[in-house]
């Protein structure tokens, strides 16, 4: 039997796995500094719940399976619904905002000819039980700071509101099929199809013109004013006021330099009600992540509660880091220790207790230990019976009395932080 992985799944080996852990830790640290708390949900959800709450857009991409009781289940295709279900079931009686975060895998089915991955790692936050510009701005700030923490040097966070397009679609008073086609074209950024739909028979010319204008509006604060001028007559002034207030807070927080207003953004999921956010890196072709406000989703579980959040794709972040030439700093082996087995065991135990990453070796001779340490990427080496460590690069000695700080921590303290 050939040892193969299923289509769309892959193994991750040492170096890449270490880099993914470093980036995950950096992003997680940002979440924690904003007072978000980690939660975990089951990998499977009831398929009927998935289908009823988030619709065919999401449920159609889910892996389905039947358990021994005959229940139809689905591997989670995204994290917003599991978090919403958790909040409704476990946090419905809580008072005040709930700040939840996660680092989890999601699974999506694709046709075999598409050649896409079917397992993805997502890092995200959900801010529950609070609404308004301040909470919208907080979600965007967390996203900006999380991307900064990854080490990416070039990225942009686009923000908009689904309320404008929905108001204009309502003003068109056309068929549900037309509205669905228009939203799909907007999400795909297919402006040719979008323009054709806005010029279709029965669509008021003023509304069609406003739609064609709005999806092309992007920029800074001035973009909000331009949208007011193009679409202000259809009842979306409140949504634009909220977006402008959020922009003010982004400027105050020092995040606006990474943010761009874009009224052409439209997420693929149907449950968004206001803020829409997506993150991009040059040349990637797909968003690094995204999210928005979904104030009606928890009502489907009988617990009405405003909510907003986002998810980042770890895989896409790693691709963007490589494309930008950003080297992820991974801490390797601090020291390789060999020599007399009993002495080696004592030294290894002592160093590990002090935070060192130590690889034990059965090698006894100094020349062989140096070569093995170099192959392992270790910073120091020693024989257990020696009184000091020896640096691999230049042969400098480091006494064990008092026990020194591990090399990675020492370097991090000099840099002023740990990555």
How does the language model describe each region?
Residues 1-81, 89, 137, 158:
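TRNA-binding/sensing appendages of the translation machinery
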Residues 51-65, 176-180, 280-282, 376-385:
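Short, structured secondary-structure boundary patches
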Residues 61-67, 173-198, 203, 255:
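Acidic, His- and aromatic-enriched active-site or binding-groove loops in soluble protein domains
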């Amino acid at each position: 039997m050939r040892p193969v992985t299923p289509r769309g799944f892959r193994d991750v080996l040492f170096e890449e796995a270490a880099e993914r852990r470093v980036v995950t830790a950096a992003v997680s640290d940002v979440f924690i500094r904003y007072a978000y708390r980690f939660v975990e949900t089951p990998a499977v959800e009831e398929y009927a719940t998935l289908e009823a709450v988030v619709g065919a857009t999401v449920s159609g991409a889910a892996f389905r399976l039947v358990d021994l009781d005959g229940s139809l289940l689905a591997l989670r295709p995204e994290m917003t619904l599991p978090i919403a279900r958790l909040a409704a079931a476990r946090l419905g009686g809580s008072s005040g905002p709930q700040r939840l975060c996660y680092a989890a895998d999601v699974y999506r089915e694709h046709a075999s000819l598409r050649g896409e991955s079917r397992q993805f790692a997502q890092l995200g936050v959900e801010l529950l039980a609070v609404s308004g510009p301040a909470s919208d701005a907080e979600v965007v700030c967390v996203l900006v700071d999380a991307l900064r923490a990854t080490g990416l040097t070039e990225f942009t966070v686009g923000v908009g509101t689904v309320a404008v397009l929905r108001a204009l679609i309502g003003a068109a008073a056309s068929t549900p099929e037309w509205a669905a086609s228009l939203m799909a074209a907007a999400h795909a950024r297919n402006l040719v199809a979008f323009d054709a739909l806005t010029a279709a028979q029965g669509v008021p010319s003023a509304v069609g013109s406003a739609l064609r204008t709005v999806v092309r509006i992007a920029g800074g604060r001035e973009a909000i004013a331009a949208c007011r001028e193009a679409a202000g007559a259809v009842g979306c002034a409140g949504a634009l006021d909220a977006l402008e207030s959020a922009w003010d807070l982004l400027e105050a927080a020092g995040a606006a330099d990474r943010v761009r207003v874009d009224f052409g953004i439209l997420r693929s999921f149907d449950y968004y009600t206001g803020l829409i956010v997506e993150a991009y890196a040059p040349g990637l072709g797909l968003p690094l992540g995204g999210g928005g406000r979904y104030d009606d989703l928890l009502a489907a579980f009988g617990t009405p509660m405003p909510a907003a959040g986002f998810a980042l794709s770890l895989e896409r972040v790693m691709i963007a880091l490589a494309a930008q030439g950003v080297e992820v700093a991974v801490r390797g082996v601090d020291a390789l220790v060999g020599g007399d087995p009993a002495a080696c065991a004592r030294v290894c135990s002592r160093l590990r207790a002090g935070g060192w990453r130590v690889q034990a070796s059965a090698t006894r001779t100094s020349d062989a230990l140096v070569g093995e340490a170099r192959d392992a990427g270790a910073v120091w080496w020693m024989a257990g019976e020696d009184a000091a460590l020896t640096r691999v690069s230049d042969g400098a000695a480091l006494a064990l009395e008092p026990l020194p700080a591990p090399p990675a921590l020492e370097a991090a303290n000099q840099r002023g932080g740990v990555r």
